[in-house]
Amino acid sequence: MQRAARLFAIVLVFAAAIAALADKRLLTEKDIFQFSWIGDPQVSPDGARVAFVKVTVNDKKDSYDTAIWSVSTRGDEPPRRMTDGKHDTSPRWSPDGKWLVFVRTPEAGGPPAPGTRPPAAQLYMLPVSTGGESWKFTDLPRGAGAPMWSPDGKLIAFSSDTNPEDLAKARKKDPKARADAAKDAPKDSKDEKPDTAPKPPADGADADRESDVRVITRSVYRLNGAGYLDYKHPGHIWVVAAPQSSDDDVKPKQLTSGKYSEDAFAWSPDSTHIYYTTNRVDDPSYELPRADVYAVHAAAGGDPQKIASINMGPRAISLSPDGKRLAFCASVNEPVQSYTEPDLWVMDLAADAKPRNLTASFDYDVCSGVGGDQGTPRAGGGDRVVWSADGNSLFAVTAQEGRANLMQFDIASSKITPVTKGNQAVERYRATHDAAEFVVLISTPTSIGDLFLADRSGSAPKQLTHINDKLFSQLNLSEPEEIWYLSFDGRKIHAWIQKPPDFDANKKYPLILNIHGGPHAAYGWVFDHEFQWMAAKGYVVLYPNPRGSTSYGQQFGNIIQYHYPGDDFKDLMAGVDEVLKKGYVDAKKLGVTGGSGGGLLTNWVVGHTDRFAAAAAQRDIASWADWWYTADFTLYRESWFKAPPFDDPQDYVNRSPITYIKNVHTPLMLILGEADYRTPPTAGGEEMFRALKFLKRPVIMVRFPGESHELSRSGQPWHRVERLQHIVGWFDKYLQGQHKPEYDDVVEAEPVPAAEANPPAKKPKNAKPKK
């Protein structure tokens, strides 16, 4: 009887699970409008609450809203909203927990007038202990950002690129400032009369006109996402007294000056000094990455004092509790490599001090992660290395074989102890005041990201937020299958297979090979809307980490130096072969796509094999030489190529997809951001498109106005949706036979001849024959 009862209970549970699954729906591309993201978590000094930025989609304005929320670390209550602005970011608790400073960008009433800038972000103060409205306490012409409280709570340091000329112009436009200036000006002598005669403008009628002409003198003059760089406005460190009420008339003071920007900064424990890093080189393109550490007196200002030099590019810097040491992450400069693992370093703040590498024997990436398409699209914040209260340990995230977890590093022994574990990606972390506990933002393949509280025991963390649970409880999502396979040379390659939620191994499915960019990056155990939606549309998605990927060790990452693309292509094809062996993929219905380096490899794939029925290359590269001349960073050092294209043109020709354009018969879609300065369309998709149109091959170009290289991750919401629709629509047409009127004008593919009728006139060296 008991056995029958147990069996009946099991049947009921199974039936309930089937019923619950039947109530769920498939994910759609438009679900992004309901997504919420968490960014920049900050733990209160008493460890009781976490302030964070909640990012949501404003579908009416096709943009993102950011507001500051908080949640208890007890995990027993829902988050509550703290600020009411549309663009509030960078929350920072005062040392006593009574105040919260944050950055607010005013809502623009429309496009700025010619010659003017949009409203600048300013610092605001929110009384937490007493409640009440926030108030603005900076008003700099070019705004303020990156606030940081002094440990004694009296001052707030921040960054601004406002310069004296900006302040003078602001005073000129402000009637109150002009009146104050007149009141303070020296009075005329009784024997002197003011000159009232009209005077012509100093330089003619256009004296006040601001030219929009750019005069370029530096190698790097624009950056993806940031636009054209203004070297006349270096970023400097300012301080302001922390106001106690909206009536306090506090005056910001500029601490650093000159033509060089300051990078990361940190307060000394006694609140007397601010330490910062800077690279005082006119054009860093010619130099190996490096930085100097300076200190400036916070109250008195004066000339900064140079403390030490670092012959690397430090990031995530953090001062020790006693203020005598500096911890940071950096990659060594030499030998010059395509990829060098970042390590964790510590050094004394003293002249001639040398950094010590704590992770020299740890063959994985420190201060690194894995990539999906749902990182916080705005106000994500950054991480710094965390010190233990006794100064004996450091904490940072490491990336290991597609996983990203928080680790503890013992400074004396270099022993490494996991703080978090599992198939996941820790995307942000913050410590309590004593570093006994950590608030971590964790993403998994079925969760965009939530806050958890973890302690140093390594036990399972406690979930604090459920920011997308209402939506995700309605969705039928599937977990990816992890696989390892052998490539052509016996090297093990790591990959994942995302299957449709109603997967049936007895059916035949179309497959999409998705290739990551970088090339030194990694897929992993993290949420990816694109993969989940492709699976929901009936595709099997294969996403591998071929050689050159991060999180698998130095040798695996750098093995493609001077050979990219090359053997990584073979890794990808071996992955497709591996999935075909499983029997549930139709070999005649294969698609391939990828972005950035993945777009380059997509172009390479269709120039070297005809096995794919369709391809979509995103933010791609067609010609390495053209990219060398136009990208937003330089390859002056011998990292990817041994020489510039005018000294060794053949190497660039051999490795450029455009060289093999006559081999391309696969229908190709090109996805381009018109403001992409990382892989400019003129060096990529535009070349592929024009060449294939000349050859009358099936090709289409989809252009996104105003979008940068980050289209898929942080572009305008509707553009992100349309991007997905076009990619999947292209595959629907060629892999599933669906009618797509928007692509009717595309020249249909012709049968591929048994042997290429028109091979390249001059076959490049090392060119590989098509399969």
Whereabouts are the PLM-identified features?
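Conserved beta-propeller blade repeats
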Residues: F35-V50, G85-V103, E133-W135, D139-A157, ...
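Active-site-proximal cap/loop segments of hydrolase catalytic domains
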Residues: E530, A536-K537, Y543-K771
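Cap/lid segment of the alpha/beta-hydrolase catalytic domain
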Residues: V281-D282, Y364, G458-S459, H466-K588, ...
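Hydrophobic or amphipathic alpha-helical targeting/insertion segments
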Residues: W93-A179
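Predominantly five- to eight-bladed beta-propeller fold
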Residues: D65-T66, G110-A121, D161-D247, T277, ...
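Mature N-terminal segment immediately following signal peptide/propeptide cleavage
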Residues: D23-T56, K60-D62, T66-I68
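Short glycine/acidic-enriched loop and turn motifs that connect beta-strands
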Residues: T56-K60, P106-P111, N163-D166, V281-P284, ...
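Short loop/turn segments that connect beta-strands within beta-propeller blades
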Residues: T73-D76, V128-G131, A242-S246, H297-G301, ...
